[in-house]
């Protein structure tokens, strides 16, 4: 019996690596995409069960031609996990234009490149699922996230749009908007991060939620609920509390 195939961008680190291992443990074939050959090899060494089901591909998500070449070689995906991204905290009082552009190129355009490359086979199969990794910083602006947050807001909006187009094609779209997760990215933050979650726990929650019939999911529950409520409050009140509790 053929295995279900998942495409995971940003597979070699953080949530991507943790989710890769969970899917392989549950019998999936994973096409892991990362720009780092070294990290992909390190990840493969940590996979103890069904190691042969991990198929690493070195590719920068900015390279649409190479992504399309990979798409031609691999099995039709049942899941496209659009996860690759970067995070650099910025002081928005400084000149950050190169950082802003880099975040847009990787976090937004990179996701679109992967989407465009791997969607056609899924459409032919008229069955599948797409999970887009956004963030609570896509709900409202957070300290130090002037480069990162807008790209995640764009991804959330993108997911909201494509779900209508793809529903009739048999493709389920979800957006995952986690709070703070322990990764190499969040280790760059110099402020208190409420509800900071272990990356393996986060990946387990993604696996659990991908089976549910809901568009957007976030975790941990209490802090994500807190942030959701604050995104609905008057700006004066929400910005005051964020300054007191996060910055």
What does each model-identified segment do?
Residues 12-13:
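Conserved glycine-rich cofactor-binding loop
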Residues 26-42:
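Conserved glycine-rich Rossmann-like NAD(P)H-binding loop of the short-chain dehydrogenase/reductase
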Residues 83-89:
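Conserved NAD(P)H cofactor-binding loop of Rossmann-fold oxidoreductase domains
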Residues 91-104:
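Substrate-binding pocket helix/loop in short-chain dehydrogenase/reductase
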Residues 115, 151:
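Active-site helix of classical SDR
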Residues 135:
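Residue(s) in the substrate-gating loop at a strand-loop-helix junction
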Residues 175, 191-225:
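C-terminal helical subdomain
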